[in-house]
């Protein structure tokens, strides 16, 4: 049986935590930042966890994570 392929775009976006959950960086922090408040940008810097409904999809894309 051949090896399963890792989805490279998912590999760059998601990291598996020690407890088995997946974390990712929040969006809306790349450009058009002048109109966003400092508080909003500060809160967007924090990593967020993948929602439970999406975990199966991420696991399928990252078989060796």
Swiss-Prot record:
Sample GO molecular function, one term:
structural constituent of ribosome
Q: Which organism is it from?
A: Hydrogenovibrio crunogenus (strain DSM 25203 / XCL-2) (Thiomicrospira crunogena)
**NCBIfam families reported for this sequence:** rpmI_bact (TIGR00001)
Q: Which UniProt keywords apply?
A: Ribonucleoprotein, Ribosomal protein
Family, per the entry?
Answer: Belongs to the bacterial ribosomal protein bL35 family.
The organism's superkingdom is given as: Bacteria
The terms describing its cellular component in GO are: cytosolic large ribosomal subunit
**InterPro entries associated with the record:** Ribosomal_bL35, Ribosomal_bL35-like, Ribosomal_bL35_CS, Ribosomal_bL35_sf
Designated name of the protein: Large ribosomal subunit protein bL35
Entry annotated with the keyword Methyltransferase: no
State the Gene Ontology BP annotations: translation
UniProt feature, compositional bias: Basic residues: 10-26
Q: What is a single Pfam family found in this protein's UniProt entry? A: Ribosomal_L35p
Lineage of the source organism?
A: Bacteria, Pseudomonadati, Pseudomonadota, Gammaproteobacteria, Thiotrichales
Show the segment(s) annotated as Disordered: 1-26
């Amino acid at each position: 049986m051949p090896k399963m392929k890792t989805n490279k775009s998912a590999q760059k976006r998601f990291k598996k935590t020690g407890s088995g959950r997946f974390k990712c960086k929040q969006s809306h922090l790349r450009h058009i930042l002048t109109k966003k408040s400092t508080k909003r940008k500060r809160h967007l810097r924090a990593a967020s966890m993948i929602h439970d409904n999406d975990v199966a999809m991420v696991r399928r894309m990252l078989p060796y994570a």
